[in-house]
Amino acid sequence: MVTNSPSRSDISVYNGDRQGPMYSLIVPIYNEEDNIPVLYERLKAVMDQLASTELVLINDGSGDRSLEMIRALHDQDKRVCYLSFARNFGHQVAVTAGLNFARGQAVIILDADLQDPPELVPQLVERWQAGYSVVYAQRVKRRQESWFKRLTAYGFYRLLQRLADVRIPADTGDFCLMDRQVVDLLNTMPERNRYIRGLRAWVGFPQTGVKFERDPRHAGEVKYTFRKSLRLAINSLVSFSIVPLRLATYLGLLAALLAIAMMILVLYWRLSETNSPLDGFATVVIANLFFGAVQLICIGILGEYIGRIYDEVKGRPLYTLAEMAGFEQLL
């Protein structure tokens, strides 16, 4: 049962007998030691403008000094809470952990590379205060990104919009603000293969966007390589559409029709006693390769869905925590 959220004019939210902050800022971190100092200073300036706020940092198994720097920030500023994974579980799982532990009435997700400008947060808050349950940041320009990255991103979002069962806004990432009501619903979803921007669209409620120009990465290396981006794209399609399964059916029907057409042509040429252009070893090899490729594509599509079912039935936890601090402040 979903209950109405408390008044957004309140300066705090109560969870049982605990008084929590009004806002939670969630930032997943993986090998971001070069960005953390600047990230904190810019987030601190934003937090000082808002009502009671907590900053939830999730160390996703970093191999550099990120965890050490996060601990220092917690000692310096008690608004900083953190979780540290026992190993790297991935960006989407790190965001999920942040949502699990965030206590704010409004929860804001942003990345640590500063491509998502913290200074945009007050605009997200304004739209939330106007009555929207989800306010997502929508990119209108990608600074210093390659033409290949821009082209593939543009094509992917348009393809996803056409194939997905729900409308997922184009040119959006995880940078958004979500109402407590939405976060509580997301926390009830046990899916292992997470696609946060799709899940937040699926839950419904009033949603709107705030347009912005995405900045280049402040420092360090890009964490979303082509391989990881491709994996995320496949996961989003499989999680929110059954069209790939239908495509496998259509490919099978097309292959069957081509086989029937070839059979009719061969019979016609044989009966008419003309030289058949389909005679010969090469024709047989080409036909076998074509139909074999169709079968492998269909098996691959089925495998993606079956693999996700296998992940779900194993029932393992999404992540394991090695360390956490700051959340006891409000217990």
From Swiss-Prot:
GO molecular function, one term: glycosyltransferase activity
Disulfide bridge map: none
Descriptive protein name: Uncharacterized glycosyltransferase slr1943
Membrane topology designation: Multi-pass membrane protein
Major place of residence: membrane
Location in or out of the cell: Cell membrane
Regions that span the bilayer: 247-267, 281-301
